[in-house]
């Protein structure tokens, strides 16, 4: 069945994973056991947010109506060492061919979801907090210490769909691309005699005998498109994944340009945008052959264009002249160069993750922040986030970690003075010279 597709190819969404559940501080109620003994269970993990390449989708239109996706928080731990329930994961469908970008710690990362079923762990759920059962020692037999759940990750994602069309129609505005697409498929693009009538790609399914392929009408390119002139970047990126190009030229020169110059300029823009595009297989369609000016130009075009005769076609999208042999040639070329196999992903295949560099979680930095000192580090900031700062046992634990990790020593070397503020995550501690630590 021939179809028309509305196109929506860029979107910005926010994904927020669930927070981990809090650990419990509970005690057994048994005779002869001090305070009953700790038996608080751990909190559950917060739900993850995944993006999944779903072949049922072919645009990003659904993100026009929903832009924020939030996973469930983990359940809190309970008595009798009961573990909290893990939060339910959220799966956000995107069309295959979607490139996902996120900026994490000032660095932008991208992941390509090209294969059906491919998943990206976009936002990781927070760890569940440990219950007090983990903090019992020979000297602390009834600890009231339990961790809070770790906050879930929240990211803003930029989505860009690079279409998976087989054939791209390229050419100057008003060369006749939209008219041709409307003739060879059931697509109904907007058609009018002024530049940039087509501002988004239109897709059409073309049938040649038993063969079917997808054709994309790439919005008209102009000189300077590779540098973004005339929305050039928005247009050119859709050419990247096509297997073959039909280069349509207004052979009549209706807009006052020389048709042979149009050919050179479009190929120059393709080459400057991405050198590989200049090597992409092309067939050239000299359109508007029903006009007298085109008939006058055809001998010159055949002589000047560096195109093999079998790849040069004289057509009229308005009358249908020459279209059938053009499509047969396109079908033959596609059949001779099948697309790379994109088998669906095995459901057991692990999800893709952001390609973050390996880091030492124990590492930390100290910098001045006005009159205060700011300590940054993955492990120490996670500890702060998962600590109840109103609880004495939690503060004692933080102090032990600051001392054991070398942070206190580094603060002294950085010039911390009695009464100075020391900020770590959400915590503001006051340095105490007498004890050589922050409180």
UniProtKB/Swiss-Prot annotation:
Q: Which residues bind Mg(2+)?
A: 178, 198
Cite the PROSITE patterns for this sequence.
G_OBG, GTP1_OBG, OBG, OCT
List the cofactors. Answer: Mg(2+)
Pfam families annotated for this entry?
A: DUF1967, GTP1_OBG, MMR_HSR1
InterPro entries, A to Z? G_OBG, GTP-bd, GTP-bd_Obg/CgtA, GTP-bd_prot_GTP1/OBG_C_sf, GTP1-OBG_CS, GTP1_OBG_dom, GTP1_OBG_dom_sf, OBG_GTPase
One of the record's GO cellular component terms: cytoplasm
Domain (Obg): give its ranges: 5-164
Q: Which residues form the OBG-type G domain?
A: 165-335
Q: Where is the OCT domain?
A: 356-433
Q: Which domain of life is it from?
A: Bacteria
State the UniProt keywords alphabetically.
Cytoplasm, GTP-binding, Hydrolase, Magnesium, Metal-binding, Nucleotide-binding
EC number of the protein = 3.6.5.-
Q: Name its cellular compartments.
A: Cytoplasm
Q: Primary place of residence?
A: cytoplasm
What is a biological process (GO) this protein takes part in?
ribosome biogenesis
Q: Which residues bind GTP?
A: 171-178, 196-200, 217-220, 287-290, 316-318
Q: Which GO terms describe its molecular function?
A: GTP binding; GTPase activity; magnesium ion binding
General function of this protein: An essential GTPase which binds GTP, GDP and possibly (p)ppGpp with moderate affinity, with high nucleotide exchange rates and a fairly low GTP hydrolysis rate. Plays a role in control of the cell cycle, stress response, ribosome biogenesis and in those bacteria that undergo differentiation, in morphogenesis control.
Listed under subunit, the entry gives: Monomer.
Protein family membership: Belongs to the TRAFAC class OBG-HflX-like GTPase superfamily. OBG GTPase family.
Name of the featured protein: GTPase Obg
Q: Which organism is it from?
A: Chloroflexus aurantiacus (strain ATCC 29366 / DSM 635 / J-10-fl)
Q: Which gene encodes it?
A: obg
């Amino acid at each position: 069945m021939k179809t028309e597709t509305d196109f929506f190819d860029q979107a910005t969404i926010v994904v927020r994973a669930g927070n981990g559940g809090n650990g419990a501080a509970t005690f057994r109620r048994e005779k002869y056991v001090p305070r009953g003994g700790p038996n608080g269970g751990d909190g559950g993990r917060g739900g993850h947010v995944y993006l999944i390449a779903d072949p049922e989708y072919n645009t990003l239109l659904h993100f026009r109506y929903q832009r924020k996706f939030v996973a469930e928080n983990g359940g809190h731990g309970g008595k009798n060492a009961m573990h909290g329930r893990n939060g339910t994961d959220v799966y956000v469908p995107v069309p295959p061919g979607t490139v996902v970008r996120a900026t994490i710690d000032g660095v932008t990362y991208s992941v390509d979801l090209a294969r059906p079923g491919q998943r990206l762990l976009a936002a990781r759920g927070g760890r569940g907090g440990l219950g007090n059962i983990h903090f019992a020692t020979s000297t602390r037999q009834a600890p009231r210490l339990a961790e809070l759940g770790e906050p879930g990750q929240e990211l803003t994602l930029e989505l860009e769909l690079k279409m998976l069309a087989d054939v791209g129609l390229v050419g100057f505005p008003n060369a006749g691309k939209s008219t041709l697409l409307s003739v060879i498929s059931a697509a109904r693009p907007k058609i009018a005699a002024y530049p940039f009538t087509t501002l988004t790609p239109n897709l059409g399914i073309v049938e040649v005998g038993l063969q079917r392929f997808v054709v994309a009408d790439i919005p008209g390119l102009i000189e300077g498109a590779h540098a973004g002139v005339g929305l050039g970047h928005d247009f050119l990126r859709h050419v990247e994944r096509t297997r073959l190009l039909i280069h349509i030229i207004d052979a009549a020169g209706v807009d006052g340009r020389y048709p042979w110059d149009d050919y050179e300029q479009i190929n120059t823009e393709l080459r400057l945008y991405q050198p590989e595009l200049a090597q992409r297989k092309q067939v050239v369609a000299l359109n508007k052959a029903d006009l007298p000016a085109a008939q006058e130009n055809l001998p010159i075009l055949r002589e000047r264009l560096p195109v093999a005769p079998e790849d040069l076609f004289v057509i009229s999208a308005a009358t249908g002249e020459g279209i059938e042999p053009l499509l047969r040639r396109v079908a033959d070329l596609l059949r001779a160069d099948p697309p790379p196999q994109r088998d669906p992903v095995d459901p057991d295949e692990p999800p893709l993750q952001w390609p973050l560099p390996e880091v030492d979680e124990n590492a930390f930095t100290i910098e001045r922040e006005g009159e205060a000192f700011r300590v940054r580090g993955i492990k120490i900031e996670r500890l702060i986030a998962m600590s109840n700062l109103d609880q004495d046992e939690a503060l004692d634990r933080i102090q032990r970690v600051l001392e054991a990790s070398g942070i206190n020593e580094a603060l002294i070397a950085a010039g911390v003075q009695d009464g100075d503020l020391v900020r770590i995550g959400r915590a503001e501690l006051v340095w105490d010279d007498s004890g050589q630590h922050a409180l």
